[in-house]
């Protein structure tokens, strides 16, 4: 009888822990300057399937920045929220932080979701698109030194004024 009672308690604890487990969908993306974390507002927990924005925090108490119908976004510079930076190589930098999830009413145990993202240190905006050896475009002989005279500008304005009066 003692063994079956102990087995029942273990099964009960396993079920209790399993029902408190949350399966949260998280998508992390980053650049050299920004980290974006998108969290689905729906979980796989059958008893409490909806996650509220005030239950989520990024790093050092940073709140959700955008609320959509089906997801929440954290968009922060990598220098905020305690986001840690690791230089992997001359070309790659890695950012690490945590997302904290504290459910409102159910299983009041705090859950910590580790997050990691890597980005290239070589910005496409800083790379040259052409070099000195690239051919230069030939200057067009058309309209290169065109300057409208005041008379020509007056004629253009008179034509526009006349056409706008015809539309009335």
Swiss-Prot record:
The gene is Oosp2. Pfam families: ZP-N (PF23344). Belongs to the PLAC1 family. Coiled coil: none annotated. Expressed in ovaries. Highly expressed in the germinal vesicles oocytes and metaphase II oocytes. The keyword Nucleotide-binding does not apply. Residues 1-21 form the signal peptide. This is Oocyte-secreted protein 2. PANTHER family: OOCYTE-SECRETED PROTEIN 2, PLACENTA-SPECIFIC PROTEIN 1. It is found in: Secreted; Cytoplasm.
């Amino acid at each position: 009888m003692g063994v079956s009672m102990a087995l029942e308690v273990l099964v009960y604890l396993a079920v209790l822990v399993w029902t408190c487990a949350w399966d949260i969908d998280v998508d992390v993306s980053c650049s050299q300057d920004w980290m974006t974390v998108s969290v689905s507002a729906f979980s796989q927990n059958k008893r409490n399937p909806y996650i509220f924005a005030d239950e989520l925090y990024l790093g050092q108490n940073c709140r959700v920045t955008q609320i959509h119908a089906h997801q929440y976004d954290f968009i922060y510079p990598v220098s905020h929220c305690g986001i840690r930076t690791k230089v992997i190589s001359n070309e790659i930098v890695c950012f690490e932080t945590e997302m904290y999830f504290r459910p409102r009413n159910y299983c009041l145990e705090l859950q910590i979701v580790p997050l990691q993202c890597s980005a290239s240190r070589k910005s496409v905006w800083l790379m040259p698109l052409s070099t000195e050896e690239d051919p230069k475009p030939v200057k067009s002989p058309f309209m290169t030194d065109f300057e409208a005279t005041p008379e020509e500008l007056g004629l253009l304005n008179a034509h526009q004024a006349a056409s706008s009066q015809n539309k009335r």
